[in-house]
């Protein structure tokens, strides 16, 4: 399972608006790939194409026939009128036994949350639970859409350390969608700079000198993490 996903000349249109323009790259087994780009660059759309949630308007998406994937969404909403514990949430649409759920919570240092209400969790705790739930099917590929959104720097460091830990345990491929550098460059094998089309693609060292990367993020210093300032 060397290449688990192969995207060839992918285009996505919403009406006449071009969201993704001629996207081609391969996802290799065991690699961590970060897709960087500003808001509105098509990052989440690309993630959904990879997951099969959106069909491309043109182009070809080839997946390994035995590929198992998991998705950690950017946001998840819980109805405050419906009481639900972490344990119940972990078991929704799941055939896994309680002890297995507990085991996967342990992997992300969140086993103490098992009986807590999902409504009472912090942003960082919810991300841990979502990450744990993404492991239940023992995926070959995990796609994380803006996993550190709303977390402070310390929370981001903790979550990225957990992602690195999971990568080591499962030897799976991971795609991280982001618009911030922060610690991403130190935690990834390959980087794709996206703004509807791929502006540059390669190892962090290779793309950090690329004109398109510098235009988007400024000069990257490995000793001083560059931070892309964005507006909400």
From Swiss-Prot:
Catalytic activity: Zn(2+)(out) + ATP(in) + H2O(in) = Zn(2+)(in) + ADP(in) + phosphate(in) + H(+)(in)
Subunit structure: The complex is composed of two ATP-binding proteins (ZnuC), two transmembrane proteins (ZnuB) and a solute-binding protein (ZnuA).
UniProt domain ABC transporter: residue ranges: 5-220
Protein topology in the membrane: Peripheral membrane protein
Subcellular location: Cell membrane
Gene3D superfamilies: P-loop containing nucleotide triphosphate hydrolases
EC number, as in UniProt: 7.2.2.20
Name of the encoding gene: znuC
Family membership noted in the UniProt record: Belongs to the ABC transporter superfamily. Zinc importer (TC 3.A.1.15.5) family.
Record's signal peptide: none
One Gene Ontology molecular-function label: ATP hydrolysis activity
Top-level EC class: translocase
Any GO CC annotation of this UniProt entry: plasma membrane
UniProt xrefs under NCBIfam families: PRK09544.1
GO BP of this protein: response to zinc ion
Residues binding ATP: 37-44
Organism: Wigglesworthia glossinidia brevipalpis
Origin: domain of life: Bacteria
Predominant location: membrane
Functional description taken from the UniProt entry: Part of the ABC transporter complex ZnuABC involved in zinc import. Responsible for energy coupling to the transport system.
Alphabetic keyword roster: ATP-binding, Cell membrane, Ion transport, Membrane, Nucleotide-binding, Translocase, Transport, Zinc, Zinc transport
Protein name per UniProt: Zinc import ATP-binding protein ZnuC
């Amino acid at each position: 399972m060397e290449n688990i996903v192969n995207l060839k000349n992918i285009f996505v249109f919403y009406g006449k608006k071009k969201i993704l323009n001629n996207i081609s790259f391969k996802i290799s087994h065991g690699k961590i790939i970060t897709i960087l780009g500003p808001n509105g660059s098509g990052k989440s759309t690309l993630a959904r194409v990879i997951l099969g949630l959106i069909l491309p308007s043109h182009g070809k998406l080839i997946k390994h026939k035995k590929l198992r994937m998991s998705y950690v969404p950017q946001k998840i909403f819980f109805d405050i009128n419906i009481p639900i514990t972490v344990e119940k949430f972990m078991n929704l649409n799941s055939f896994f036994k309680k002890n297995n759920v507990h085991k996967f919570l342990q992997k992300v240092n969140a086993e103490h949350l098992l009986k807590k209400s999902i409504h009472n969790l912090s942003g960082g705790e919810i991300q841990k639970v979502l990450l744990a739930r993404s492991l239940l099917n023992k995926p070959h590929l995990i796609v994380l859409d803006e996993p550190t959104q709303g977390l402070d720097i310390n929370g981001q460091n903790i979550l990225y350390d957990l992602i690195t830990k999971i990568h080591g345990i499962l030897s799976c491929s991971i795609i991280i969608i982001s618009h911030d550098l922060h610690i991403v460059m130190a935690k990834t094998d390959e980087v794709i700079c996206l703004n509807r089309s791929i502006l540059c693609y390669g190892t962090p060292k290779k793309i950090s000198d690329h004109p398109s990367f510098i235009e988007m993020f400024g000069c990257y210093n490995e000793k001083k993490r560059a931070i892309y300032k964005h507006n909400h």
